[in-house]
Amino acid sequence: MVHPLAGQPVKKEDLIQVDTIVKDFFRIIPNHEVIEERVSFGTSGHRGIASKGTFNELHVAAIVQTICDVRQEFGATGPCYIGQDTHALSQPALQVAIEVLLGNRVKARVDAHREFVPTPSVSRAILRHNAEAAVDNVADGIIITPSHNPPEHGGIKYNPPHGGPADTAVTKRIEALANEYLEKGLDSIHRFSFHHLVGAHESAHCGCCHHEEEQVVAPAAISLEEAGQYLEAYDFKMAYVKELPQIINMEAIQQANPKVLINALGGSGGAYWHAIAKEYNLNFTIINSDYDPTFSFMSYDHDGAIRMDCSSPYAMAEVTKKLGDHILAIGNDPDYDRHGIVTEEGLLAPNQYLVVAAKYLNETRPWKGKGVGKTAVVTGLMDAYCNASNHPVYEVPVGFKYFAPLLFDGRIGLGAEESAGASFLQQDGTVWTTDKDGIILGLLAVEMLATTGKTPAEQYVDITSQWGTPVFQRVDMPCTAEIKSALKGMKPSDVSMTELGGSPILDVRTTSLFEEQPIDGVKIVTDTGWFVARPSGTENLYKMYAESYLGEEGLARLMEDGKCTIEGLVTITD
């Protein structure tokens, strides 16, 4: 059920108290004996809330210390590129991360302009560096972000030398060792206090960090002079902006110069959009680009939460209203790994835009015919188009980490997630980023408009006229731990029925089509659609996804039958 405030402007009384949240980050010590307070990597890093003891100073210190301990196992021998988004907790977490890197004599490359650094910019920096790096100077990266989560949340993720999200083997190793540090406490961490360095090395520090006067930091066996040598300034922004013609037809955009509204959504890439508009002299109107960790300009999401989800029509409601005479609007989440595309018809669903992007890229890039990577919950239209145009589909579990090696070695031209995350290859067929990039997906929509004269929404209509018009829904369902456990351990044989939503079942899978990796749930395919259920990694709920070619009524039947199937699992497994 949609919350009555969904789509309405956020009220002042619902905004976070930044000072309180930051104090909780340093003040609260997580209890390693409480499962919820231990380090736990989901599909993209460790996330939590300071007041609940799930994202605090010790979590960040323990994770970064572990990264320093084991990064050479993953091939990282050189600098660590570090970025952060605009969540309130990202600033103190960045401070802690830098201090631990310095204490371990790992070169920390931070933004030269004291600006925020988006996820795709970190990924691009790692790949740019490693393209010419010697064996003893291979880079990796750390990104401080809880993505589109509400303002009180914090998060941290690790990108190894391939530039994308760490795979499960890497995160499990980090998780296990970090929890050992969590048990030992801050005294076990090698760390150089940022206070000593700010005055001596002002030119390179991030400028965004919070400083606690009474903060206790275990001394590191490193001098002030030596620590200064391990903190390096790097111009993330302009390196990224100047390389855009390698992946986007910026000349076509310049020539057409359509009027585009950019909703920076208070995120880490606001300065990037300004730099792009200036560098290429584009007709962009940029809003919500100021730093506001309360995200006071937002509208409530579907459940009444403040969530910076650029793919949500409720969170993007105010932007849709402001489209005016702009042909297109683009939105991004706080760390800029997601995209939202708005036309006069409204906000395009990610599944709609991603199939449009796949078709357009295949028709315009020299590397056309490359495979398309999609998660198990991306629209079946993608399969229909790819099968008709004779290029392979790589269907993987949910999580962009599964696309990183496929993009890195060029097996796929596009990697696409239903949650509005994607990246694609450069014009010459080489890798751009191995993490999601919301900026290039936004610019691609502008390029489409410039070269075809059609908006992505109009191009989607062209696609559905050939392969049908599916309807899609995703719902988060509260559940017991028993249902989550049963769902994660589900086998295809647990589904005994022959129909779902009134249509014959063609296939039941608990592994992906590509490499048969566990999807931590189940996918049921019928002759008129599909249903997926998978448990949340951090909350007592499971996610239901369904797509039907039988309209809204068919979708409702599919969802209801799927829900009954999942909730019957506990009885089946007892």
Show where each model-derived region lies:
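Internal gly/pro-rich beta-alpha loop/helix module
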Residues: 130-202, 209, 216
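Flexible hinge/switch segments at interdomain interfaces of large molecular machines
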Residues: 33-43, 193, 216-219, 286-293, ...
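Ferredoxin-reductase
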Residues: 2-12, 75-164, 383-384
